[in-house]
C-alpha cells in the first residue's frame, strides 16, 4: 500500500513536482474517478473494454498503449447475462 508523506508548503513552492502518471488522459493513476453519463450511453461497455485492454487484451478503443496488469471489474448494477452479452460482443472483435 502506498504511503504519503506530508507536503511542506515552502518546499512545494520552490521545487517542481514530479510528473503525474496517467491511466488515461485526465485520469491520474492511483486516484478515484467517476464515469458519468445518461443510461444507455455505453459506460459499462467502455469500462469493460478498458479492463480487457489493461488485462492484456487488444486496443479495441484505439486509445493507444495502456499499462497492463491485474484488473478487477465490478459491475454492481448488471446481471451476469448482460455481462456475458458484452463479453461475447468484445470477443467478436
UniProtKB/Swiss-Prot annotation:
Entry's Gene Ontology BP terms: plasmid maintenance
Coiled coil residues, start to end: none
InterPro entries assigned to the protein according to its UniProt record, in alphabetical order: P-loop_NTPase
Pfam families: AAA_25
Function recorded in the entry: This protein is involved in regulating the plasmid copy-number. Increasing the level of this protein results in a higher plasmid copy-number.
Protein name per UniProt: Regulatory protein RepI
Keywords on record: Plasmid, Plasmid copy control
UniProt source species: Escherichia coli
Gene3D superfamilies: P-loop containing nucleotide triphosphate hydrolases (3.40.50.300)
Record gene name: repI
Highest rank taxon of the organism: Bacteria
